[in-house]
Amino acid sequence: MNQQPLVSGDWDKVEKKKGFFRSFLRDYGKVFGGNAFLLVGNMLVFVIALCVVMLFVPMVFPVFLPDKLKEYILDTGLVEKSLVTDESVNNIYYLMCMIASFALCGLGLVTNGPFCSAISYYFKNVLIGENDFKPDIKKGLKDNWKRSIGASLISLVVTIVLIYNIGFYQSGAMWSGMAATAAKSFFFCLLSFWCCMQLFVYPLIACVELSFKDVYKNAALMAVQNFPIAILVFLIQLILFIALPFTLVFQFGSTGYALMVIFYLLFSFGFIAYISMYLTWKAIQKILNNSL
């Protein structure tokens, strides 16, 4: 692999942009291109994410089953019983599964690793002002595809295991009461922290010469050292990929659906990838400064 060496002088170029939002506004056109690239990449793993949603998410959220969803809609009393047909419920169910699948991709839990590391490499060069889209993407794919595929598989397996454990303890199959609640909360916290770690994994793969083990070790350390910001970004991810899409679709109908698609096409994935690279640079700069 031939990643560019990380030196403190590179960060000086980033700092001249005077903050994240000014940097993002200046680079939005490039972020838009990166968003399109990531959207294509995520389409390739969307089927995998959809399988995870259909097989494991109902263990945590039973409404992700058509019959349970129908019961929930009827219990709310907000819709006349005559309107709650199997066809309408199935349409809502598949829409929910679609949004949840994109959410797994947006949270970095089910990803196309080579595409994520390639766009991280490109965004790093965008931040230092030495970017060229096609060569950067090509180099990012060529240099890091093996480790990135490994990271994708690890993320998928860990995500499934954590979701399964949350659902298992929620069902009360082994424990009940406070013990089950504590176990479920523990695995939920692990899943949340795993999401925070994913913010740093692909930028580290793309930009630093580290062993596979050290990538995850440093991602965990960076998530801890930058915990308040990482949690803030995690909350932004939840808003962009869960709260906002569900609100738009179920409150504003076809107009909301169109707005959701626009967010996916123009903004959501690229914005999070850009934040991810920016956070990693700041974390690396802290390490460089402490080593001086």
What are these regions (language model features)?
Residues I163-V201:
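Membrane-helix boundary elements
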Residues M1-Y169, C196-L199, L204-Q237, F241-L292:
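Helix-coil boundary and N-terminal low-complexity module in membrane systems
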